[in-house]
Amino acid sequence: MLKPLGDRVLIEVSEEEEKTVGGIVLASTAQEKPQTGKVVAVGPGRTLDNGELATVPVNVGDTVLFEKYAGSEVKYDGQDYMIFSAKDLVAIVE
């Protein structure tokens, strides 16, 4: 399994619907980029200037909302993931 470093978070991105409510199939270029996903791994946090560790504010299993164009795509063991810095996470979905 991948273990993020620093304040990074590994997310399994939610799949978006390929059809509209009316049943029209959308081309992949017309689909909105997903902005939610499930946290699968969390780094230890970021070391502050005073030496203290600022932990990441999410936990494994959380569903999060993230910035639309942030993060890096990663493929590991046949699965697609994205890695984000904690600052690119917008909210926890409850």
Swiss-Prot record:
The keyword Chaperone applies. Keywords: Chaperone, Cytoplasm. SMART domains: Cpn10 (SM00883). Its main location: cytoplasm. The keyword Ion transport does not apply. Gene3D superfamilies: GroES chaperonin (2.30.33.40). GO terms for cellular component: cytoplasm. It is found in: Cytoplasm. Together with the chaperonin GroEL, plays an essential role in assisting protein folding. The GroEL-GroES system forms a nano-cage that allows encapsulation of the non-native substrate proteins and provides a physical environment optimized to promote and accelerate protein folding. GroES binds to the apical surface of the GroEL ring, thereby capping the opening of the GroEL channel. Belongs to the GroES chaperonin family. This is Co-chaperonin GroES. It comes from Tetragenococcus halophilus. The gene is groES.
